[in-house]
Amino acid sequence: MQIILLEKVANLGNLGDIVKVKDGYARNFLIPNRKARRATKDAIAEFEVRRAELEKIAAEKLAAAQAVGEKLSGQAFEITQKSGVDGRLFGSVTNGDVAELLKKAGYEVEKAQVRMPEGPLKMIGEHGVQVALHTDVVVDVTVNVIGDHA
């Protein structure tokens, strides 16, 4: 299916690009989330009329994400979990736990924005975690997992 992107989509294209994607991806994700429209003649003409407005909105989102990214970048956060004497956690610290930790610290972050390269944290100690605030703004934070010996 041919679609026109209404915002930047990772691994697909930028605002205004006309791309071909699988029908299911367009119908089930891009179009319902208002990230794209079908590339009909009418939709392309309407997009060209609204292009400046959409570019302004995209620039505002990027600027807001960069401002939050500057505050968040390099910060360290602590979380306590029950652990054994060998340093292994009972359970793990997931991206949802890190998102809750960041929300309590005053940052609006969803769990889908938290990226953990090695998967959930299962050991005590300091771990590097990435937070994707925007497709162009990814910041590194440190999560210090403190063991609460049971």
UniProtKB/Swiss-Prot annotation:
Q: Would you kindly state one Gene Ontology biological process term found in this protein's UniProt entry?
A: translation
Provide the GO MF annotations for this entry: rRNA binding; structural constituent of ribosome
Recorded protein name is Large ribosomal subunit protein bL9
Stored PANTHER family? 50S RIBOSOMAL PROTEIN L9
Similarity field: Belongs to the bacterial ribosomal protein bL9 family.
Question: Would the keyword Lyase be found if you checked this record's keyword annotation?
Answer: no
Keywords from the UniProt entry: Ribonucleoprotein, Ribosomal protein, RNA-binding, rRNA-binding
For this protein's source organism, the top of the classification is: Bacteria, Pseudomonadati, Pseudomonadota, Betaproteobacteria, Burkholderiales
Function in brief: Binds to the 23S rRNA.
Species name: Burkholderia thailandensis (strain ATCC 700388 / DSM 13276 / CCUG 48851 / CIP 106301 / E264)
Under Pfam families, the record lists: Ribosomal_L9_C, Ribosomal_L9_N
- The record's gene field reads rplI
Q: Which GO terms describe its cellular component?
A: ribonucleoprotein complex; ribosome
InterPro entries membership = Ribosomal_bL9, Ribosomal_bL9/RNase_H1_N, Ribosomal_bL9_bac/chp, Ribosomal_bL9_C, Ribosomal_bL9_C_sf, Ribosomal_bL9_N, Ribosomal_bL9_N_sf
Name the HAMAP family for this protein: Ribosomal_bL9
Give the source's domain of life in one word: Bacteria
